[in-house]
Amino acid sequence: MMKNLILFLLFSGSVIAQQSEVVYENIIITPLKSSENLLIQGVKKHNEKYHSTGETTASLYSVLVGKHSGKYIWLNGPMKMADYDDMPDTAHMEDWQKNIRNHATDESVKIAKLNWDASYSPPSWGSPKYLLWRTFKIKQDNDSYQKVLETITKIGKVLSAINAPHPRRVYESVFRSEDREDITLVYPFKTFTRFSESNGLPEGFQVEYDRINGPGAFRKDVGDVLSLHTNGWHDEVLMLIE
């Protein structure tokens, strides 16, 4: 039930008022392989005790594909930045140590804020088992970040205009990372057949983009901007741990 709730909150715009502040805490956990199952069970115990009620809930994903494959991502939200002023108490942290850190070799934390304007959220989609995370490697100059965000926002507007079948949420890192991988697109999906033809934008999207924005607009607004202002992107596939 808790897992279904967090997924529903992630992708349903009807629960959270549009334009309200929505933040998710992502902790990437490297498991101690000799006690990996104990880590999974420990996360479940910790989540049930501390993160199963209220507006903010937590869930665990296994990274199947990508640079963090073999690791886990603990996802906590939706939150507001003000929530970080109320840090976990000693008992809470001792439970995290006992059930999670004792079975892990490393943790890294990222705080991501939902960009409503750039996202595309159909009214109802359901709770997916899998997530595709697409993270851009933005160049380290003064204007590349904003240029890339503008492009992603334009794509979101066209997805909305054509009533695209799949949601796409856009999350920005609250705190700048060293490698500038600070914009991530999140695509939920239910089956890997989703990638039989394409692993991103809907089939025929470029044609629709040019129809709405003018001939050659997709190449200028998307292709040229991403070529000039990023060093590409990388994908990761996450699976919900039941």
Question: At which residue positions do the language-model features occur?
Answer:
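Short S/T/G/P-rich N-terminal loop/turn motif that feeds into the first structured element of a domain
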Residues: 17-242
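Sec-dependent N-terminal signal peptides
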Residues: 4-14
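N-terminal leader/presequence-like segments
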Residues: 3-5, 45-46
